[in-house]
């Protein structure tokens, strides 16, 4: 994939040059006393960059009905915001470097994986009912822009801060949670891709590896890693900055109640709901938190529902 390497090198060069030029302009247009014309937390510039970045890819996707750039645009946007805020503030404290690197590793890994997958599959079925409806398609991209900006808030605030307290337990806990979450997501993605690419598994749902312990291990990993990022950011937060908890709450809510688990459960129920073995799989397999099937399958229904999030929403398309 030589074209991809060239694209990434070009993107990196353009972004570095652009950010350097932007910082020069901002410094030259500062108010008296050295205060930037932008807000101290870089909320405006990250919002502007996110909107412009997503809009540019939306034009490609909508104009060419081209699904291959959608997830790539979302994942790489996180990396751009983390690097942008780090370069603009230019303090490079250890905590800032670590969080920027963690977001970069996650974003690049996910972007390349999703790009490789969509190149194999050819199209994204999520957009089957949206490609011909510009308003629906635009709504998806608007939500994606809000998702990127909101979930990036903890790293944005850390990179914009002059506070640099010593490394604390919260940092270590956050980094560990990120590592466990990122590893879980990466392993789950590879296991499912390998399962789907095996002709022997055609017409089957994935229950291999981590997918035998939870129906959505990739989402469990993603939720865990973003809560880890938030926890690692807490030593820097003060006052109203604690509102950045909206980031992990937002990604958790989206995956649990909106475009994550509900959509995939409905799709799987529609496709496999008539199979007794699939119903047994759902009964014995946790929707999110990994647990041995022998444990989860024997838990009382109230424990599954109230503690492990086996919500009625996840069975709405399962007919009797």
Where are these regions (language model features)?
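Short, hydrophobic transmembrane alpha-helix segments
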Residues: 32-38, 58-68, 87-91
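Interfacial transmembrane-helix boundary/kink motif in multi-pass membrane proteins
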Residues: 98-101, 125-143, 167-172
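Select subsegments of transmembrane alpha-helices in polytopic membrane proteins
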Residues: 72, 135-148, 215-222
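C-terminal ends of transmembrane helices
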Residues: 55-66, 112-118
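Juxtamembrane membrane-interface segments at transmembrane-helix boundaries in membrane proteins
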Residues: 22-40, 129-130
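A basic- and aromatic-enriched beta-loop-alpha substructure that forms the phosphate/nucleotide-
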Residues: 95-131
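Juxtamembrane helix-capping/reentrant segments at transmembrane boundaries
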Residues: 66-79, 122-140, 204-211
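Hydrophobic transmembrane alpha-helices
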Residues: 2-23, 40-54, 77-107, 151-191, ...
């Amino acid at each position: 994939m030589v074209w991809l390497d060239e694209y990434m090198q070009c993107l990196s060069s353009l972004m570095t040059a652009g950010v350097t030029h932007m910082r020069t302009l901002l410094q030259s247009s500062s108010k008296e006393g050295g205060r930037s014309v932008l807000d101290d937390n870089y909320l405006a510039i990250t919002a502007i960059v996110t909107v412009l970045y997503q809009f540019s890819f939306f034009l490609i996707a909508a104009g060419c009905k081209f699904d291959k750039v959608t997830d790539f645009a979302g994942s790489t946007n996180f990396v751009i915001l983390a690097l942008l805020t780090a370069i603009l503030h230019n303090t490079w404290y250890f905590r800032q470097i670590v969080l920027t690197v963690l977001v970069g590793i996650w974003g690049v890994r996910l972007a390349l994986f999703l790009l490789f997958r969509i190149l194999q599959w050819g199209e994204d079925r999520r957009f089957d009912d949206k490609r011909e409806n510009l308003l629906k398609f635009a709504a998806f991209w608007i939500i994606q822009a809000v998702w990127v900006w909101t979930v990036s808030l903890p790293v944005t605030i850390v990179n914009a801060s002059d506070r640099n307290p010593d490394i604390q337990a919260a940092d270590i806990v956050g980094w560990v949670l990120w590592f466990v979450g990122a590893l879980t997501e990466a392993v789950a993605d590879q296991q499912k891709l390998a399962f789907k690419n095996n002709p022997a598994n055609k017409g089957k749902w994935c229950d291999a590896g981590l997918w035998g312990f939870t129906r959505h291990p990739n989402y469990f990993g993603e939720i865990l890693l973003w809560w880890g990022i938030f926890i690692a950011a807490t030593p820097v937060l003060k006052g109203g900055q604690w509102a950045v908890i909206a980031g992990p709450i937002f990604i958790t809510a989206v995956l649990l109640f909106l475009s994550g688990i509900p959509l995939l459960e409905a799709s799987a129920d529609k496709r496999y709901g008539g199979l007794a073995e699939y119903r047994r799989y759902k009964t014995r397999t946790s929707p999110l938190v990994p647990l041995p099937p022998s444990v989860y399958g024997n838990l009382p229904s109230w424990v599954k529902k109230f503690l492990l999030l086996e919500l009625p929403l996840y069975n709405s398309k399962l007919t009797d």
